[in-house]
Amino acid sequence: MSIDQVTLARELNHLRELAQKKWEEDPLPTGRDAEVRLKKEIQELALESHITDFETDGYTVLPPGTAAPIELFDEIASVMEGLAKRLKTDNPAVSGLGETLYHMLPEHPAFERALMARAPLTLVTYLLGYRAKLSQCTGLIKDSNVPALGIHADHSAKFPAPWSPISNYSVVSWVLTDYTRENGAVCVWPGSHLRGQPVPENLVMAHDHPEMRVLEIPRGSVIIWHGSLWHGALPRTASGRRMTLVLPHVRDSVQPQELFWSSVTEEMISRNPPRFCTLMGLTSGPPWFQDGPDREQFVMSPYGGSKFE
């Protein structure tokens, strides 16, 4: 049974029309204007040290109180616990990821508020440009049965190596419970993003390598990293659960892993700033059906040559 492409095209075009109206409220910059606007936003939010972190280490951590009030973290954790009881989850205990919830964005407005939080989104813009799209809205729940997650780079299995210094994929992790060694914290290899290469096979489980750094950080923190950064996670040995909201993003030219333009609603568009539509992929040129590309859509696409578009 095939999908009714006529109905799908009509519904998608309707959402794109709404997105275009929102766009007119606050058009995204191109070319040199994108760099100027981003620099101003970074200064307004005092994020300069985090930009330095990206360049040297390939990741940065926003401390509690920077991305959002702690109440939002607690609300997200509560919502995820409820979703885990009624929705299908994925990944056996041996995977290293833990219990995984996919495509959570349409399930609760709390995820929208996390997505639109200004400081993390500004850092995503630095890595992927103003037209970055949300690729996943995923919840990870690790209990004491979950082993270590192998060290890897998110560009692996997505882009051929050697990778460009420019990131095409970036992860934003909302730390909903304390990260400690015993709790199965994320670990990273600082500066590995500069190699532009996948993790060698002999280092995939080298969590105790002297170059690896364990991120022992409190609940309420947010981690953002470059797609080429080598990272993994320790096994959880403590009782209880480690919970994380994971929001990977991609550049405008890259296809997201989850089809948000197919599940976004008019209400979601209405209650969010204009850039929400871009994150949903509604201001990108593709995809299209037999009616072909909408030329007005391409007006909203990057065309000035800046990596910050």
Where is each model-derived feature located?
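Conserved double-stranded beta-helix
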Residues: 20, 195-200, 204-224, 228-229, ...
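Short hydrophobic-aromatic micro-motifs
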Residues: 61-62, 172, 223-225
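Non-heme Fe(II)-dependent double-stranded beta-helix
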Residues: 2-161
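Catalytic core of non-heme Fe(II) oxygenases with the double-stranded beta-helix
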Residues: 148-215, 254-263
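Short connector loops at helix/strand junctions that flank enzyme active sites
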Residues: 134, 146-148, 167-169, 240-242
